[in-house]
Amino acid sequence: PNARLIWAHSGIGGAPVERVRALLAKYPKLMGELSYRPGLTDGAGGLSAEWKALLTAHSERFLVGSDTWINARWAGYEGLMNEARRWLADLPEPAARRIAWENGARLFGLPTPAR
């Protein structure tokens, strides 16, 4: 019950928002990581409406990820972070800040970066 778990991709197969919401309710220490997340964004790179609602309501439970699991993926890191900045901009500023860095800092016991 005290274990903290980071759920890679918040479901790599594109788990429906309802499923993600149910698992967050069932497991209070579950954190959703948001790299390679089908359905997260709309066609223009902004957040889909259902994910915007979920991330706004549960911003303390998600964190940005990059999915740089092999060295070759680091070549596209800047682009990945630019994509994340694009959809983070669709959230209220406090929620975006939590997802972008505060939740990760808290999870790993690091000081919260100054704004």
Predicted regions located by residue number:
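Residue-level detector of flexible, active-site-proximal loop/helix-junction positions
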Residues: 12, 38, 69, 103-106
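Conserved, mostly hydrophobic/aromatic
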Residues: 9, 32, 67, 96, ...
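Alpha-helix capping and helix-coil boundary motifs
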Residues: 43-47, 69, 76
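Catalytic pocket-lining loop regions of alpha/beta-barrel enzymes
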Residues: 1-64, 114
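Mid-to-C-terminal alpha-helical segments outside catalytic/metal-binding sites
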Residues: 60-61, 71-115
